[in-house]
């Protein structure tokens, strides 16, 4: 239960508190771009991922709502939703280093730098352009849930 509560506090409540604290400063600056870090789990679900998927669906809803609320202001809002990325997430989720590494055997997952490049790209767009939702997956991952992955021998 404590892991579930921590996940919801981090992924939903943490996002709400961050937006509440930071939005006045973004407005005061006269321009801004707010990024939400979502997940493909905010678009689909998978077995054993109910709470995580629910939390990422929550992040997606918060991003969409903020985009509506800021319409007409010079502030862009983008949700970046990565698929399989080789980060510590898998180790935390599985609590086993070998199992975590096994998720990526024979495939090339996203790296944190790939996500950073996507964010940089969105930042560099003309001011009047807003990317609402950016789903980012490696070429080897076809489905949001990882149900279809190309693995090399």
Give the residues covered by each predicted segment.
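Active-site loop immediately N-terminal to the catalytic Tyr-X3-Lys motif
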Residues: 46-50
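A short helix-coil junction within the Rossmann-fold of NAD(P)-dependent oxidoreductases
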Residues: 21-30
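Substrate-binding pocket helix/loop in short-chain dehydrogenase/reductase
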Residues: 3-5
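Active-site helix of classical SDR
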Residues: 19, 55
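Residue(s) in the substrate-gating loop at a strand-loop-helix junction
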Residues: 39
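Alpha-helical segment proximal to the catalytic Tyr-Lys
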Residues: 24, 68-71
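C-terminal helical subdomain
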Residues: 75, 79-83, 98-145
